[in-house]
């Protein structure tokens, strides 16, 4: 791919340098770090803002709906934007500034105001935060067409994106969360009685959340406000660095000559409605991606992971170990799949292979959970990335169990198949943008990106509510379960429903949606030839 010319004017193909795609993909990781930060916000709302568990989950859903509502408006602005700084890069800058400012206010300011003001201020801060999130997120989709329109190069974005997300989501974050962050900020009355008393005095709702074990009161780190202030500064700083890399990656290609037909276009609301009604590609992609995202958000929810490893398997630290052990194999299989399937057979085929593979792995993993639940027979070595001496635990076979080994093997393929189905949808939005140029002559990347995000956020916003409601049904109505919660049959089946049941529904939606998705590899080659012709005619007309 690196030996191909950056432009093939006869075929209307323009390509990006490989490093440009890699840097551009950092923008998606930048916003995903904020998603990780806010992924456990229900704990903060319960402990610090003072809401009940179900209400905290519902607030997350309501605010995600607001998140979706802002998308079409931002998309319209993107499609009308053409500055000296480009069409897309200004939105990274604006979004990043708002994200840091509002998240700082949420986690550093709120704990220091009166209880009566916390919830109203949280709503204000979060509404503004969402606008920033939308501004930066839209660029991940809207800039895809101007970066490259080569169908064989677009999956490279998914390859970089998968590497970044696997390393962060599967490797660094679980180990950091379960092995460092939560243990560091978990307090017990034997050692931190005065600190717990001070936090309860400042945040009265924490009194109902303290767990007693062997006569010692424990405040889980998820409910410690100091954890959130540190977490925000860490994620905000990393996100800023990644956003800068994303801007650099777009620098050469974020210009008018790479926008659609290469000239100015007036986009109206009527055009948007026509796209919604007739672009079958984006319709089916939205159905597939949104159902998948709902399931993924529910499965990866902090409460679900804490219960699965801390309560059902019996050792929360094993979450980080499993993630660390599986990361490299998952990464290698994912990259191989994107290279051999997405680039050679098409992105649609890649999504379907990932879907069927995920479903098969999930069925087998359910049996492992049922066989291991609360029996003390699930074991994998625990180790710390900061303590080299603990790496030897991996070769201590006494720390491995059969169920632990089976889980590791299945988790590798489960993760790889999940990445194939989930990460390929972003470059697929670029195909839908080109399909719209082919279908109607309109170049509306902002609409494609924000329409995708709108429905995606609207549906996936149900995840916190579903997690809260399902756990409330088995006895956790006042607070979400943590790794310190007691085991019960109810908590077992609630976790299975969230970790496996909801994803299964999403995978079935994938299969149905892809039956009607028109953009195969062969179709995209035809589309690029027609788009090149449309662009050439438009440029000749502009010169005349």
Please identify what each model-predicted range represents.
Residues 2-544:
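Membrane-embedded alpha-helical bundles of multi-pass transporters/translocases
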């Amino acid at each position: 791919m690196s030996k191909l010319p950056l432009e093939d004017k006869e075929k209307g193909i323009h390509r990006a340098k490989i490093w440009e795609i890699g840097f551009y993909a950092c923008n998606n990781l930048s916003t995903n770090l904020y998603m990780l930060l806010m992924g456990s916000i229900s704990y903060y709302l319960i402990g610090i803002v003072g809401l009940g568990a179900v209400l905290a989950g519902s607030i997350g859903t309501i605010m995600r709906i607001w998140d979706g509502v802002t998308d079409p408006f931002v998309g319209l602005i993107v499609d009308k934007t053409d500055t000296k700084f480009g069409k897309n890069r200004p939105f990274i800058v604006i979004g990043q500034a708002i994200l840091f400012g509002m998240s700082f206010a949420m986690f550093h300011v709120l704990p220091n105001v009166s209880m009566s003001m916390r919830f109203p201020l949280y709503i204000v801060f979060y509404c503004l935060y969402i606008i920033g999130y939308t501004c930066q997120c839209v660029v991940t989709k809207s800039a895809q067409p101007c970066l490259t329109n080569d169908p064989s190069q677009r999956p490279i974005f998914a390859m970089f994106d998968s590497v970044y997300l696997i390393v962060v989501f599967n490797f660094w974050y679980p180990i950091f969360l379960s092995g460092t962050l939560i243990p560091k900020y978990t307090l017990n009355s034997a050692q931190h009685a005065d600190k717990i008393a001070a936090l309860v005095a400042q945040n009265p709702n924490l009194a109902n959340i303290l767990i007693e074990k062997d006569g010692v009161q424990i405040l889980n780190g998820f409910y410690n406000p100091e954890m959130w202030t540190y977490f925000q500064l860490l994620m905000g700083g990393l996100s800023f660095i990644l956003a800068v890399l994303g801007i650099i990656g777009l620098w050469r290609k974020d210009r008018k000559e790479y926008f659609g037909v290469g000239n100015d276009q007036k986009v109206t609301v009527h055009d948007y409605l026509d796209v919604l009604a007739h672009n079958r590609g984006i319709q089916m992609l939205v159905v597939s991606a949104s159902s998948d995202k709902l399931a993924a958000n529910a499965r990866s929810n902090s409460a679900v992971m804490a219960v699965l490893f801390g309560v059902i398997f019996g050792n929360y630290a094993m979450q980080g170990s499993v993630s660390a052990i599986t990361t490299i194999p998952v990464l290698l299989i994912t990259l191989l799949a994107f290279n051999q399937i997405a680039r050679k057979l098409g992105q649609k085929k890649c999504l379907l292979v990932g879907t069927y593979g995920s479903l098969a792995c999930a069925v087998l993993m359910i049996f492992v959970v049922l066989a291991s639940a609360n029996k003390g027979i699930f074991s994998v070595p625990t180790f710390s990335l900061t303590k080299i001496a603990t790496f030897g635990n991996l070769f201590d076979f006494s720390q491995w169990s059969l169920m632990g080994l089976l889980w590791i093997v299945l988790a590798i393929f489960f993760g790889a198949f999940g990445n194939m189905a989930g990460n390929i949808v972003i470059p697929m939005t670029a195909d839908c943008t080109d399909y719209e140029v082919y279908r109607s002559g309109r170049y509306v990347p902002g609409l494609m990106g924000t329409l995708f995000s709108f429905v995606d956020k609207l549906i996936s916003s149900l995840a916190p509510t579903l997690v809260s409601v399902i756990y409330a049904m088995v006895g956790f109505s006042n607070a979400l379960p943590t790794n310190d919660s007691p085991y019960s049959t109810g908590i077992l089946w609630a976790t299975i429903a969230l970790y496996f049941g909801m994803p299964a529904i999403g995978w079935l939606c994938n299969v149905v949606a892809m039956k009607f998705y028109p953009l195969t590899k062969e179709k995209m080659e035809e589309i690029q030839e027609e788009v090149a012709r449309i662009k050439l005619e438009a440029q000749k007309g502009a010169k005349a």
